[in-house]
């Protein structure tokens, strides 16, 4: 597709912004080792088919550091939105509904006249169907989970939180077409509206009834708390190394050094690539009160980072520590 391309250098990036200054340009800062980036590239490809007047660009964050540093890209996937060569918005993380909404909203206001070769605006029913299927559980509400903008939305957010329900949300106040269209599409006149697997569950009253009857647990997808997830990960193997990259390909010098040391001990260990999961990356810093990576754990207990491992190696204690003898 002419409007879905790659930028492999600073020069290419600048040229793409210059050549598409009259329309919206969406840049996906990605990494080939991150599965969520691959998923979002698929979303971008679909959006490119529907929004021919918008330019969609993939840029490998680590391959073009000049651009990544300029725009303070610290994790992938990250999306930047440009018009007239200037950044106008940003989206961090793999959030397909939010990306779709931003492309629709930011792209609709400009880009010059629509030419004869451009595709007509996406059919509303198709768009609504795609939105309600964007996640296993979708909540259409006023505002966001962080800032609900009506009492009913605030109540339903609290219920979902209390029952550890995993969901994505869409702010109907940001899109009047979706707000009005969904009422007719689902024959449900009020908000919030909750969907599971593309099927309407109902609004606040229905969700409250599910709570009272004890059926809510079996209706909604559950989420695991971050703390429980971290506990599970650090105990996944007797020796766990949280690093940038994996055994086959370390993605920073510190991780590469600790891999060499670990491989020379002959002790079996497992690894977790923190670059693939920002929630784990940030959560582990707080959970273990250790701000840097790599981090080494034995039987669920933090041993430390590269410096500690080097000290244990020099003191002749590393192998016994890894075997849980100390």
UniProtKB/Swiss-Prot annotation:
Keywords, in A-Z order: Cytoplasm, Iron, Iron-sulfur, Metal-binding, Repeat
SUPFAM superfamilies from the UniProt entry: Thioredoxin-like (SSF52833)
Domain topic, free-text comment: The thioredoxin domain lacks the two redox-active cysteines. This strongly suggests that it lacks thioredoxin activity.
Subunit structure: Homodimer; the homodimer is independent of 2Fe-2S clusters. Heterotrimer; forms a heterotrimeric complex composed by two bola2 molecules and one glrx3 molecule; linked by [2Fe-2S] clusters.
Gene expressing this chain: glrx3
Function: Together with bola2, acts as a cytosolic iron-sulfur (Fe-S) cluster assembly factor that facilitates [2Fe-2S] cluster insertion into a subset of cytosolic proteins. Required for hemoglobin maturation. Does not possess any thyoredoxin activity since it lacks the conserved motif that is essential for catalytic activity.
Compartments (UniProt record): Cytoplasm, Cytosol
GO MF terms, alphabetically ordered: iron-sulfur cluster binding; metal ion binding
Keyword Ligase: no
Pfam families registered for this protein in UniProt: Glutaredoxin, Thioredoxin
Single biological process term from Gene Ontology: hemoglobin metabolic process
Residues of the Glutaredoxin domain: 125-227, 227-326
Protein name per UniProt: Glutaredoxin 3
Knockout mutant characteristics: Morpholino knockdown in embryos reducing the levels of grx3 protein to 40% severely impairs the synthesis of heme and the maturation of hemoglobin, and results in individuals with fewer red blood cells.
Record-annotated Thioredoxin domain positions: 1-108
PROSITE patterns cross-referenced by the UniProt entry: GLUTAREDOXIN_2 (PS51354), THIOREDOXIN_2 (PS51352)
GO cellular component: cytosol; nucleus
KW Repeat (keyword) present: yes
Residues annotated for [2Fe-2S] cluster binding in this entry: 150, 252
